[in-house]
Amino acid sequence: MVRCSCVLFRKYGNFIDNLRLFTKGGSGGMGYPRLGGEGGKGGDVWVVAHNRMTLKQLKDKYPQKRFVAGEGANSRVSALKGSKGKDCEIPVPVGVSVTDENGKIIGELNKEKDRLLVAEGGLGGKLLTNFLPLKGQKRVIHLDLKLIADIGLVGFPNAGKSSLLSKISHAKPAIADYAFTTIKPELGKIMYSDFKQISVADLPGLIEGAHMNKGMGHKFLKHIERTKQLLFVVDISGFQLSSQTHYRTAFETIILLSKELELYKEELHTKPALLAVNKMDLPDAQGKFHVLMNQLQNPKEFFHLFEKNMIPERTVEFQHIIPISAITGEGIDELKNCIRKSLDEHTNQENDAYHKKQLLNLHISNTVSYSEPPSKTAVSSPRMDIT
């Protein structure tokens, strides 16, 4: 019987994926009631996405984490219309979600130069405000980073994800023979001969209870949300976190990983998934792989090995299952080809769906335009009587 085990709490180290900031729009400028002059509007506070920015850089550069825009200029005889206050721009990494103090999403920045208004400047003094300026908006915001990658590596600690990433890309993650080698996300790119690039994210190892924020919990799982596809990486010989925890076979790790994703967010199961069975260079690996394939073909026949609360509602259906060895390089080329094929198929499906939607909208638009009754205000042609 498979049981949930207690796990250790870990930190990301120097990696930061959330930050709390105070923002304030600038106050408006004074109006000039005698001449009807209007004060300038206060500056706005914007969050702007930059590819080379990190939240740690932002925190180090602005340790006070306060961002206030400039005040609008007062109206005066030589300039009755006061100039607008200087805007304040907060540089953030691409992939940031911005929420307010109540957790309400203000917006997301998913590509370079995306901009989001987070605190508006106050109006300048004018007739409407009795020529008195208004204060700028005050707002506490939370920046939450979710990595954007084509492929997200999913697996228990020490499954060989970091070794695999270094083998298929130019990334150089920390690699060692103990659990939790990866304590912060690592990004790499697979380069193909036709110059196609596919980004891969190696995330800290998932553990049982991650959906309840155990271990790295939500810090790990939230990054999976923005990957296009998932690549499960399992050790063919199984996994055991420590001598105090239960040993898991390769099949058990797949089922438990699937359950953790399901409990965190069900739609993660809708993502296309591949499975890389690692460490095939070990003794008896071929025999264990044969057993694993049989179990994956008929997973429900083996659910009696699990506690009821650890059985997923639906099991992950892998598009490709590839036996590999990140050490010897066995199966690496096949894996890269399968990743490329799977992503290309997914892109084609998305494009087809988009074109069908556009055609449907066009058809509906044309149908509505043809069926519209004549306008009541339309002028009818004059009747001509021929005598």
Swiss-Prot record:
Family annotation (Gene3D superfamilies): GTP1/OBG domain, P-loop containing nucleotide triphosphate hydrolases
Protein name: GTP-binding protein 10
Residue sites binding GTP per the record: 155-162, 202-206, 278-281
All copies of domain Obg, residue ranges: 13-148
InterPro entries noted in UniProt: G_OBG, GTP-bd, GTP-bd_Obg/CgtA, GTP1_OBG_dom, GTP1_OBG_dom_sf, OBG_GTPase, P-loop_NTPase
Function: May be involved in the ribosome maturation process.
PANTHER family per UniProt: DEVELOPMENTALLY REGULATED GTP-BINDING PROTEIN-RELATED (PTHR11702), GTP-BINDING PROTEIN 10 (PTHR11702:SF43)
